[in-house]
Design a protein with these regions (language model features):
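Short, Lys/Arg-rich amphipathic alpha-helical interaction segments
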Residues: 96-98, 102-144
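Short S/T/G/P-rich N-terminal loop/turn motif that feeds into the first structured element of a domain
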Residues: 1-93, 100, 104, 134-144
Length: 144
């Protein structure tokens, strides 16, 4: 079964239908390919680059666009194991990116410079989850 690397059209349309003028936080869960899967014709095709190295290239090359739209990474964790969920599900990277509003995220993913750099992410990722959240003030107990 192919992993989720890029959003489906219906998912992206649903994202765009949500409010665009409020802050958002995006939970990223990423499972990497052992070897990056660059397409033929890409300068890194066949070089034996790891998925992690390709993802780091994505992070480095897209950082200027991410910063330009006002994005910032607010949490990073190293996944250690699944406590609840499919036993065979694992993630290599986990982080939350925050944007001043959904419009900033849309500006980033449609930016021509970013679209060139995202090829590293596409080569790096075997499977991923990207989940949008509206930031809220935490309460005293779980779910509050």
């Amino acid at each position: 079964m192919a992993g989720s690397i890029d959003p489906l059209r219906a998912q992206f349309d649903a994202f765009k239908a949500l409010p665009r003028d409020t802050p958002i936080q995006m939970l990223n869960l990423v499972r990497l390919n052992a070897l990056a899967a660059y397409p033929e014709g890409h300068p890194n095709h066949g070089k034996g680059m790891s998925g992690l190295d390709a993802y780091r290239a994505y992070g480095r090359t897209s950082a200027a666009v991410f910063k330009r739209v006002g994005g910032r990474q607010i949490w990073v964790g190293e996944p250690e194991g699944v406590v609840t969920g499919p036993a065979d599900e694992h993630w290599d990277l986990a982080f939350i990116a925050e944007y001043p509003d959904a419009g900033a995220f849309l500006a980033m993913v449609t930016d021509p410079e970013y679209r060139e750099h995202v090829k590293h992410r596409q080569a790096a990722v075997e499977d991923s989850r990207l989940i949008r959240f509206a930031p809220v003030e935490a309460g005293e107990g779980f779910g509050e």
